[in-house]
């Protein structure tokens, strides 16, 4: 609401820049490009452009409707299964419209509400210096709708002198819709199964499965499988090879050693086969050429920690 406004950077593409712009001269004129500059505006080599971000004192509060229900089944004394459905709808979402979307909506529709937000530098640039930028301060968006199903399964059995435990937790994503522009229903997009400058990677299905053997004495060992279903790139520029990222699988292993009922030593290796994170173009990346915080960006790595109790 009262967040200070300042210039920042957005990742994407200026469709009116470059020797061969993706939009027509008439469309680019809507964004402030005169005929004399069409085809001569420089593209940002880093795919980064200026935007004015910050608060807005005219915001309304968000409104949320949430529906959840689930079932838990104890199939046997040592096996449990649960399924949960959830549906979340948010109206008047407080966020900003993606600057690239603002430029495209201005260009293709000529709506003053969007075109007034695009300020080009004297040379037509949106990235050279600070005089060219897109105003993308917070507003009340149309809304968001997220819907999915969570599944969980667990099984425990005694054997070989210890206890075996297996479990699986997964999410099936049904809907991840955003309506950024209340007055333009066609601007609504669903991110399930996609990745682009507006959609953080959203696999339709992802899960984590673990298997543990506990000696019930001084040690236990655990294996873990993390799975992310493939996502398809949906955008105007080729930022991913073959326009998709295939299924990603990561295997981890760890062991715990217990000493004197007061000390635990845990050692492990995550991503034991050193699977590399998918490479993406600069406008999709959150860190250089990868998407940090989702797929493993470090490759194989080892860890250890010690816990003391008293």
Q: What do the predicted segments below correspond to?
A:
Residues 70-72, 152-154, 254-256, 268:
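Residues within well-ordered beta-strands of beta-sheet-rich folds
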Residues 80, 91, 174-176, 226-234, ...:
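C-terminal beta-signal and adjacent terminal beta-strands/loops
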Residues 80, 84-235:
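Gram-negative outer-membrane beta-barrel transporters
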Residues 62-63, 145, 160, 202-205, ...:
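A structural signal for short secondary-structure junctions
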Residues 2-7, 97-107, 182-190, 237-245, ...:
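Flexible, surface-exposed loop regions and adjacent strand-edge segments
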């Amino acid at each position: 609401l009262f967040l200070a406004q300042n210039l920042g950077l957005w990742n994407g593409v200026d469709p009116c820049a470059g020797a061969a712009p993706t939009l027509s001269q008439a469309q680019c004129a809507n964004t402030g490009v005169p005929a004399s500059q069409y085809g001569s505006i420089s593209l940002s080599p880093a795919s980064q452009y200026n935007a004015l971000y910050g608060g807005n004192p005219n915001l309304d509060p968000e409104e949320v409707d949430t529906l959840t229900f689930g079932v838990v089944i104890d199939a046997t004394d040592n096996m449990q299964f649960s399924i949960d459905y959830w549906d979340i709808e948010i109206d008047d979402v407080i966020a900003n419209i993606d600057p690239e979307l603002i430029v495209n909506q201005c260009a293709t529709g000529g709506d003053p509400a969007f075109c007034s937000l695009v300020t080009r530098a004297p040379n037509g640039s949106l990235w050279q210096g600070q005089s060219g930028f897109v105003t993308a301060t917070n507003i009340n968006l149309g809304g968001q709708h997220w819907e999915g199903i969570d599944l969980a399964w667990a099984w425990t059995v005694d054997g070989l002198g210890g206890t075996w435990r297996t479990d699986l937790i997964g999410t099936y994503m049904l809907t991840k819709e955003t309506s950024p522009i209340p007055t333009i229903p066609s601007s609504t997009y669903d991110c399930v199964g996609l990745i682009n400058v507006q959609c953080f990677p959203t696999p339709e299905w992802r899960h984590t499965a673990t298997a543990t053997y506990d000696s019930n004495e001084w040690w236990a060992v655990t294996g873990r499988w993390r799975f992310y279903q493939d996502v398809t790139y949906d955008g105007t520029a080729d930022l991913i090879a073959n326009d998709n990222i295939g299924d990603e699988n990561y295997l981890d292993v760890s062991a715990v050693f217990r000493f004197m009922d007061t000390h635990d030593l845990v050692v492990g290796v995550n991503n034991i086969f050193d699977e590399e994170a998918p490479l993406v173009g600069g406008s999709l990346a959150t860190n250089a050429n990868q998407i940090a915080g989702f797929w493993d960006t470090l490759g194989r790595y080892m860890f250890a920690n010690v816990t003391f109790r008293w």
